[in-house]
A protein has these predicted regions:
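Metal-centered catalytic cores of metalloenzymes
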Residues: 2-6, 14-18, 22-80, 84-146
């Protein structure tokens, strides 16, 4: 009888431990990138600017963390945003604005809704950087899972 009680206690503790850590075991970090080019704007922009977005999305915390480097813009960045949902040939509204405009690199983070995370994972977001000379956007790239 003591052996049964001991085994039951050990099994209960084991199951409780597994359940306590189960959500963390299903979490994942996803990596995203976008190559930013003037030719990718809709409509295309005649410019020499280019850049690269790298981002990670933590599925447990729903936090998107990003860094954007850019060079050869026609002027300083005036604004930058994640837009969606849209394919590479369409425009869409802002879903995540960059809060602090600085020189390259731009860095930030945002907490996404489930719908935003689904659009991001489906490749329906793009990122672009705006300047005074190109108010609609000077460089753009479709954000894709790596």
């Amino acid at each position: 009888m003591k052996t049964f009680a001991l085994r039951s206690t050990i099994a209960s503790v084991g199951i409780a431990t597994l359940l306590a850590f189960a959500p963390a075991s299903f979490a994942a970090t996803e990596t995203y990138t976008a190559e930013l080019k003037s030719a990718s704007e809709v409509p295309p922009v005649d410019g020499k600017g280019s850049g690269m977005l790298t981002a990670t999305y933590d599925t447990a915390t729903k936090k998107l963390t990003y860094s954007v480097t850019f060079k050869d813009l026609s002027g300083p960045p005036a604004a930058a945003h994640f837009h969606g949902p849209a394919d590479a040939k369409s425009n869409a509204g802002v879903v995540v604005p960059v809060k602090e405009m600085t020189a390259s690199p731009l860095k930030g983070e945002a907490t996404l809704t489930d719908a935003q995370a689904a659009d991001l994972a489906a490749g329906k977001w793009y990122f672009n950087v705006h300047t005074a000379n190109n108010k609609g956007g000077e460089i753009r790239g479709q954000v894709m899972k790596k």
